[in-house]
Amino acid sequence: MADQQLGVLKALDVAKTQLYHFTAIVIAGMGFFTDAYDLFCVSLVTKLLGRLYYFNPTSAKPGSLPPHVAAAVNGVALCGTLAGQLFFGWLGDKLGRKKVYGITLIMMILCSVASGLSLGNSAKGVMTTLCFFRFWLGFGIGGDYPLSATIMSEYANKKTRGAFIAAVFAMQGVGILAGGFVALAVSSIFDKKFPSPTYEQDRFLSTPPQADYIWRIIVMFGALPAALTYYWRMKMPETARYTALVAKNIKQATADMSKVLQTDLELEERVEDDVKDPKKNYGLFSKEFLRRHGLHLLGTTSTWFLLDIAFYSQNLFQKDIFSAIGWIPKAATMNAIHEVFKIARAQTLIALCSTVPGYWFTVAFIDIIGRFAIQLMGFFMMTVFMFAIAFPYNHWILPDNRIGFVVMYSLTFFFANFGPNATTFIVPAEIFPARLRSTCHGISAATGKAGAIVGAFGFLYAAQPQDKTKTDAGYPPGIGVKNSLIMLGVINFVGMLFTFLVPEPKGKSLEELSGEAEVDK
């Protein structure tokens, strides 16, 4: 029963919202700011990379990345993230959250800078070094998912735990926004300093050599917020739940949380034996785990997988959709710097109007209406809006209807973030036992990233027109944007069905949810 919960953990559960909660949100949230900035900023500069390194003076179109290179540049960080989520999720349960937390941040800082310094005498050399460092950048980013979620859930009180974890995740939206603003600022400065003709006017001069610095500056900027929070990450004590329930050191947990809560907590020697009860030490691959949490893990992994197919395929390739409906002019009518500016402006507008508000709506309502309701509603609304865009797609691409298209498209993003994009991150940090919490969150997140890889790689090919003569250079014919959007709508609907496997953690302590507060079974 819940009354068997340790006093130190009960104190955390009923603690009033105070400064240390907000400090933890900022420290963990800045990691997510960097995560989102790094993962999405590359979508702002892929067109520029094509112009710089794959320029063909005989072509009527500016240079573009060959399909395999575009897939690698867009997807390699996602592959690294998947590996990092599994590895650091497991390590966070083995060594402790705090010990591993600094390593992920150092990796992010070093690899962000190294990505921007990618060198080589040829296009192949630059792309190879860029992909190498982006893989390891993703590896560090991957570690931040299970660790940030677990740390925040273990520090929070049960009344506002959902909002605190959601606030950490909402920093992703700010990171995406920052990526857009940095790209806008950098491209504007370079445009004033190095004015250039359009590609149609002069194929050679439309991409000034100085444009090579633009993508490097944008990519490297991601290291700055991570570097600023490193000191504070190292100052955080280990979470009481890890120290007491996994490391079995209730004395240390009580001392740590007395400092954090700024109050004297009584040490409970009588429950030391209960914490060491072998009945509560079942492993991840045991029958007991399968009985208690098997369906929960299936629910968290499947919903995250399906959500990320839709979310990442849209997000990474927004610029292609905007080009298709004419929101971004034809590449040949712009120079390289203007193209970066126009893509950044379009993505920033979408983020400002839909992505960021969606995250903060989740923060506001998650502890009122619950995780289950938000996730179910989000998947349902994403399905509705995706079909509303897809079936009359030929109507939306008419010039008079473009604003309507962008509104509908923005609403799918709003309900992704005021919906499953936030809840799939929050719930796995709440419903599993402390000794497996980080691992299970890592498994759930990695399955999500597998979906992101399917979306990122698959959408590149699927969205190509069915007419061979209209495909991008090097791509085979696909099923077209309309059919791709219908597929994404179906995926969202299936995600809604799998949501019924996920329990509702609202208002319950972590020990109640995981079964760690039960003495006899």
UniProtKB/Swiss-Prot annotation:
Xref: Pfam families: Sugar_tr
SUPFAM superfamilies per UniProt: MFS general substrate transporter
GO cellular component labels: plasma membrane
Location in or out of the cell: Membrane
Source taxon at top rank: Eukaryota
InterPro entries: MFS_dom, MFS_sugar_transport-like, MFS_trans_sf, Phos_permease
Gene3D superfamilies from the UniProt entry: MFS general substrate transporter like domains (1.20.1250.20)
Ranges annotated as spanning the membrane: 25-45, 71-91, 100-120, 132-152, 162-182, 212-232, 293-313, 349-369, 372-392, 403-423, 442-462, 485-505
Inducing or repressing factors: In roots by phosphate starvation.
Membrane topology of the entry: Multi-pass membrane protein
Keywords: Membrane, Phosphate transport, Symport, Transmembrane, Transmembrane helix, Transport
Entry comment describing in which tissues the protein is expressed: Mainly expressed in roots, especially in the stele of the primary root, the pericycle and trichoblasts of secondary roots. To a lower extent, present in hydathodes and vascular tissues of young leaves.
GO annotation, biological process: phosphate ion transport
Topology feature Cytoplasmic, residues: 1-24, 92-99, 153-161, 233-292, 370-371, 424-441, 506-521
Function (record text): High-affinity transporter for external inorganic phosphate.
Cited PANTHER family: SOLUTE CARRIER FAMILY 22 MEMBER (PTHR24064)
Protein's name according to its UniProt entry: Probable inorganic phosphate transporter 1-3
Gene: PHT1-3
